[in-house]
Regions:
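A short, solvent-exposed, low-complexity linear motif enriched for acidic/polar residues
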Residues: 34-262
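C-terminal motif of bacterial Sec signal peptides marking the signal peptidase cleavage site
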Residues: 29-32
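Bacterial N-terminal signal peptides that target proteins for export
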Residues: 2-22
Length: 262
């Protein structure tokens, strides 16, 4: 069973069990991951946003012409996010603050896609984000049919006008390690952003070697599988956590990276 709602163009799908896990995670966090007293660290509303961007728009652009490749849509199915408390990363089973999965969304649409949660001031050593396969019952409300049984679907065109589609069924749990050993979420710095760097994801894709059918490039397990492997090898490396100082769900002009995948 799933429960869905719409936020802008983003279809959010929550699994009821996650709400129980979230409550348990909050309790574990309050007892084991925060420092100071309850009075000293009152809870506040925090926000975790998600967006696709390009660190090299001359190579891969998002939505606008100008790159060797232009990505018009970036559909992802994202499950639970776990924040690992400072000092817990060295333990075999680190305590985590679990946030409900965002679900399915187009992260190149320009919409502000976010999860809001209550938390007390604390430091974290890492974040874990899980990609999952889109289920048949989730294909609704504008979600492309081809996303079914896949976790990632990118669509766009090359500079010469050739359309392309990439479908991946990879389901990794991507771990973002803190750049400086730990990062803090506080009432004054409560908004963060997970960025998906499409330039990193597509950097090693050899478009010239792609097999074209009907003038289009399809990259999947069935066609151009070597190019899919190039993409999937860069998946974790293209995900990072940033501050979102103005809370607009986009990368700040002066980027402050908190954690990164490898």
């Amino acid at each position: 069973m799933t429960r869905g709602r719409r936020l802008g163009m983003l279809c959010l799908v929550f699994r009821p069990i996650l709400h129980g896990l979230f409550a348990l995670g909050m309790a574990a966090f309050a007892s084991g991951c925060s420092s100071g007293t309850e009075t000293g660290n009152p809870p506040f509303q925090a926000e975790l946003s998600y967006t696709a961007y390009s660190s090299a728009p001359q190579l891969v652009a998002v939505g606008d012409a100008g790159g060797q490749a232009v990505v018009d849509s970036a559909w992802l199915d994202l499950d639970t996010v776990a924040l690992l408390g400072q000092g817990r990363c060295v333990e075999p089973e680190p305590a985590a603050l679990s946030l409900p999965g965002l679900g399915i969304g187009d992260h190149a649409s320009g919409q502000h896609n976010a999860t809001r949660f209550a938390v007390s001031r604390a430091e974290y050593c890492a974040l874990e984000l899980t990609f999952v396969l889109a289920q048949p019952e989730q294909i609704q409300g504008g979600v492309p049919q081809d996303l079914q049984w896949h976790s990632v679907m990118l669509a766009g065109s090359l500079a010469d006008g050739t359309p392309f589609t990439l479908l991946s069924a990879a389901t990794p749990t991507v771990r973002l390690e803190a750049d400086a050993g730990s990062f803090e979420i506080s009432a004054k710095q409560a908004k963060t952003l997970i960025g998906f760097d499409l330039a990193t994801w597509l950097a090693d894709v050899d478009w010239a070697s792609a097999t074209r059918v009907g003038g289009a490039i399809d990259i999947s397990a069935q066609q151009n599988a070597a190019l899919l492997a190039q993409f999937e090898s860069n998946l974790a490396r293209g995900v990072a956590l940033y501050r979102d100082a103005d809370g607009d769900g986009k990368l700040d002009d002066v980027r402050v990276r908190l954690a990164h995948g490898e």
